[in-house]
Amino acid sequence: MRLVLFILLLPVCLATPFHQKGLFDFMLEDEGSADLASTDDPVISGFGPVCPFRCQCHLRVVQCSDLGLERVPKDLPPDTTLLDLQNNKITEIRDGDFKNLKNLHALILVNNKISKISPQAFAPLKKLERLYLSKNNLKELPENMPKSLQEIRAHENEISKLRKAVFNGLNQVIVLELGTNPLKSSGIENGAFQGMKRLSYIRIADTNITSIPKGLPPSLTELHLDGNKISKIDAEGLSGLTNLAKLGLSFNSISSVENGSLNNVPHLRELHLNNNELVRVPSGLGEHKYIQVVYLHNNKIASIGINDFCPLGYNTKKATYSGVSLFSNPVQYWEIQPSAFRCIHERSAVQIGNYK
């Protein structure tokens, strides 16, 4: 009986402990069995491109931000669609830095120390749509930017010139951000933006320009020129902007708006003229068909005319105002005729008072 029991327990004693196999184990096992089956066949690796040291790679997104990098990492995965290099110490973008990145759609270079971009650095990026160059030391935007670009953001640099050649062929750009640069009106070449047929949004805020740039494309729907040194608005500055819906001119030194200027922007819906030197409400608001929001607070407006905001007749079609700000002006609310706001149906839409 003891002999029979010993024979039954012997296989159990000799058995190895159970080990749960993962995917990696099976891959190794398959690789080993393949080697045993044929030693002449080449070994094909199952791993994808190697992620650059200290970077993180996931689903074709390569994140190399906040690493103190002084140059673009080498051997970036060729299937990368988004490359994040922000918050580093990169000083130069060289030819070949982005070789093989034919599928890159977005490149983030924000908050580095970039002062130079080689002429052919972006040449391989045939599908690049978004280029973020803000918070660097660039004095000019580079030429030969990819024709596929739809969005360029380069605020907070040292840009003092905008040449027409830089934007030539950039027919797909929709958004252009160039604020907080030491840019002057004399540094913007006449018609610099004319070739940008799809440009819809442009922001040149907090610079030293003294007038609205000339030759802006008619495709514009938003123009933001806040925080500059513009002293007046003339009709020529807004000429041809028939699709403009939002115009930002706050925090300038504007003291006058030429008669007829608003006729050049017939589809305007928002006008921001707060924090300027205006002494009267801009002419043309009453006859403007679509304007709904007008910011005029923090100016020097001392009186409101009965037809400044509303058309002469009651039967004239006009969009309803949703916001009119007049606070922090010398005009007193009791000096304003109630009929001056006859086309405004909501009392809360008008803000008056608080002048010191």
Curated annotation (Swiss-Prot):
Keywords: Disulfide bond, Extracellular matrix, Glycoprotein, Leucine-rich repeat, Proteoglycan, Repeat, Secreted, Signal. Glycans are attached at residues 45, 208, 259. Residues 16-29 form a propeptide. It is found in: Secreted, Extracellular space, Extracellular matrix. InterPro entries: Leu-rich_rpt, Leu-rich_rpt_typical-subtyp, LRR_dom_sf, LRRNT, SLRP, SLRP_I_decor/aspor/byglycan. Gene3D superfamilies: Ribonuclease Inhibitor. Its main location: secreted. GO terms for molecular function: extracellular matrix binding; glycosaminoglycan binding. LRR repeats lie at residues 70-90, 91-114, 115-138, 139-159, 160-183, 184-209, 210-230, 231-254, 255-278, 279-301, 302-331, 332-356. GO terms for cellular component: extracellular space. Binds to type I and type II collagen, to fibronectin and TGF-beta. Forms a ternary complex with MFAP2 and ELN. Belongs to the small leucine-rich proteoglycan (SLRP) family. SLRP class I subfamily. This is Decorin. It comes from Coturnix japonica (Japanese quail).
